[in-house]
UniProtKB/Swiss-Prot annotation:
Pfam families: Ribosomal_L3. One of its GO terms (biological process) is translation. Gene3D superfamilies: 3.30.160.810, Translation factors (2.40.30.10). PANTHER family: 50S RIBOSOMAL PROTEIN L3, LARGE RIBOSOMAL SUBUNIT PROTEIN UL3C. HAMAP family: Ribosomal_uL3_B. Methylated by PrmB. GO terms for molecular function: rRNA binding; structural constituent of ribosome. This is Large ribosomal subunit protein uL3.
Length: 229
């Protein structure tokens, strides 16, 4: 199990294959993604790496966090995320990862926070059909109708689809294809859409339901190695 990457969603565009097929892609940017600290079985009971991405202003970082960054000899980071890894894939503190961590044709899982929609009704939130336009219905055309039974069970069951807050929740989109990568500019192009608005942070991991293809760098795609090639 390898580490993932922290990236920022730039936006969507499209590219054309050699046979002229148009492919919609989401552009993800990897910016100064470094290992800030590590976790070990002896000390923490599990193996993981803590990655940081983006450069934060020192005034916006707490004093304990500043001490951690200083100990790791890395710049203060805007986003910190921990990734579980296999012991043989543990990285040294200060290692900077690049977009070459993934290869074209590979499948990845992307986790992000969806765009918040506020309070939404049943038709928008759950795709309900609504009530009749006529036949005695008035005012309640877009309502979701009945919410339960009668005295027995005498309650609305938990999880009932009703109007409420929509969006602004963590979602993972699985099995997205990596169309291409640009290690020099730190760009990853994945086929299809990714949760979140432009500029939001997303986590990119190897797909859990797909086999890793040959040629994937182990333990990770390090920036120094990518630039040396």
């Amino acid at each position: 199990m390898r580490s993932g990457l922290i990236a920022q969603k730039v936006g969507m565009t499209r590219i054309f294959t050699e046979d002229g097929t148009h492919v919609p892609v989401t552009v993800l940017k990897v910016d100064t993604c470094q290992v800030v600290s590590t976790r070990s079985v002896e000390k923490d009971g599990y193996v993981a790496v803590q990655l940081g991405a983006g450069t934060a202003k020192v005034k916006n970082v707490s004093k304990p966090a500043r001490a951690n960054f200083a100990k790791a000899k890395v710049e203060p980071k805007k986003k910190l995320v921990e990734f579980r890894v296999a012991p043989e894939n543990l990285l040294e503190v200060g290692t900077e990862l690049s977009a070459a961590h993934f290869i074209p044709g590979q499948y990845v899982d992307v986790t992000g926070t969806t765009i918040g929609k506020g309070f939404a009704g049943g038709m928008k939130r759950w795709n309900f059909r609504g009530l009749e336009a006529t036949h005695g219905v008035s005012v309640s055309h877009r309502s979701h109708g009945s919410t339960g039974q009668r005295q027995d069970p005498g309650k609305v069951f938990k999880g009932k689809k009703m109007a409420g807050h929509m969006g602004d929740e963590q979602v993972t989109t699985q099995n997205l294809t990596v169309v291409s990568t640009d290690a020099d500019r730190g760009l990853i192009l994945v086929k299809g859409s990714v949760p979140g608005h432009e500029g939001s942070w997303v986590l990119v991991r190897d797909a859990v339901k797909r086999k890793l293809p040959d040629g994937v760098p182990f333990p990770a795609g390090v920036k120094a190695a990518a630039s040396a090639e």
